[in-house]
């Protein structure tokens, strides 16, 4: 698998949050994966209302938010290296999308936010990492590398460990 994180711009400013009650979706960019559709969303956690805008793709080699910096590298083996490379080559539009997301400046993200909230000011928003997942890459029924969207339970051959991968 390949680790991907979801990042959002967030504001806790009560004046801004009070003006938005709900969720507003935009339209996906050409070549962008379906889970990347930008949206503005009110969230309440522990009684604190916030407004989130995103998601933006983030990256770390960790499989979990608090995982090891070596997770990805420790998972690469001779038997899965070809699948990982093949999945990337077969999905160059997705790879390009991820690279451009990772290189996006704060200003560029703010410009996207202003399409939803024209009066939004950068000083009121900060970037958070909302979650971490592992994108499934495996051999398909035809033996060729595929990136699988959705979720899948993966377990060790001896059944002593299992995990849920995907989004």
Predicted regions span which residues?
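Alpha-helical membrane-targeting segments
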Residues: 59-107
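Short, low-complexity, polar/charged sequence segments that are solvent-exposed and flexible
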Residues: 27-31, 70-75, 144-147
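Flavin-dependent oxidoreductases
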Residues: 1-69
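Glycine-rich phosphate/pyrophosphate-binding beta-alpha loops
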Residues: 161-167
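Internal hydrophobic alpha-helix adjacent to the cofactor/substrate pocket in enzyme cavities
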Residues: 73-78, 112-114, 119, 167
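Glycine-rich loops and low-complexity Gly/Arg-rich segments
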Residues: 32-37, 76-80, 153
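Flavin (FAD/FMN) cofactor-binding core of flavoprotein oxidoreductases
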Residues: 3-7, 12-14, 86-161
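Charge-rich, low-complexity amphipathic helices
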Residues: 31, 46, 74-75, 135-139
């Amino acid at each position: 698998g390949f680790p991907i994180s979801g990042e959002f711009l967030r504001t806790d400013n009560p004046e801004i949050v009070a003006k938005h009650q709900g969720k507003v979706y935009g339209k996906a960019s050409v070549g962008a994966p379906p889970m990347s559709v930008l949206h503005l969303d009110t969230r309440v956690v522990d009684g604190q209302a916030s407004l989130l805008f995103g998601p933006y793709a983030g990256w770390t080699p960790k499989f979990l938010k608090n995982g090891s910096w070596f997770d990805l590298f420790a998972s690469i083996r001779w038997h899965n290296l070809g699948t990982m490379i093949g999945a990337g080559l077969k999905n160059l539009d997705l790879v390009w999308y991820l690279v451009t997301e990772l290189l996006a400046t704060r200003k560029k993200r703010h410009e996207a936010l202003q399409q939803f909230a024209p009066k939004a000011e950068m000083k009121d928003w900060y970037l958070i990492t909302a979650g971490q997942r592992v994108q499934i890459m495996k051999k398909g029924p035809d033996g060729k590398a595929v990136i699988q969207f959705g979720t899948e339970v993966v377990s060790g051959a001896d059944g002593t460990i299992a995990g849920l991968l995907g989004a």
